[in-house]
Amino acid sequence: MYSACDVVRDAMAQSHLCACPNDKLPQCKGVTKAPPECSVFHVAKLQDTKFKWKYTLDPLRAQKLDQINKDIEKDAITLRLIYGIELSPEDLEWWKMQRCLINKNTGAKGGQFANKYLERQDLELLGYSPTPLIGGDLMFTALPDKVLRTIPVAWDRFLNPAIMIFFLIILLCVILGIFYVLVRNTLRRKQKNKLHQMEIKRFIKEKEQDPYIHTSFESWPADPNKEWKDLIPVYEAQGYCMADYRKKLGMPPGPNC
């Protein structure tokens, strides 16, 4: 009984012929068509294309997805005729196929690949490269081979240029939301502090305008600043700095300054 990995390994054994017919490739001389085992790569490539179309706003989305599903079914039929088993297209994706190329017992890297992940350069030569990194082909050719070989194929799912714009928009909205909340709270705090300062100044001014202050008819208590001194701790309890007022009234320094 064949497994998905058996099918993938068979395809890898024939991978040097999967780009045929191509007169420019020496291994394709006399080869009129690619081996049917290469249908595995067709399905993997179609799965990537399907993933991109699934998250687009293009008006042709439904039509494209329908055609892709039909193409996948054709290759699935080919594989069914070869191996006599029903393979799920979801099992034939680049990031799942790469698991089949490692020896389960020794951990040795399998096939023609020097890395445990399907190397992009090798797949590119076969015409079956996975979805490129964000930035498309420009970024793909700009990065050194050593860097590309350290990036798992599965990461392409999240670095896909077709859907990355949505993640960037969401991130931008979150940043703007946080910035708005911080600015709003700061302005509210300043406005509230300003109103309290105005209220305090008005209170002092009203007290200083008492016509009977320092006379026998003085309406103030023995300490003319008693009410004000009692009020300062109230504002300090709310987090305000009352250093200037404490100094003016001859009081010791307080908190929040």
Curated annotation (Swiss-Prot):
Membrane keyword on record: yes
Topology class, membrane: Multi-pass membrane protein
Induction record: Expressed in the late phase of the viral replicative cycle.
Disulfide bridge map: none
Principal localisation: host cell
Residues annotated as transmembrane: 123-143, 163-183
Keywords attached to this entry: Host membrane, Late protein, Membrane, Transmembrane, Transmembrane helix, Virion
Protein name, as recorded: Transmembrane protein C257L
Keyword Transmembrane annotated: yes
Protein family (similarity comment): Belongs to the asfivirus C257R family.
GO CC list: host cell membrane; membrane; virion component
Localization (cell): Host membrane; Virion
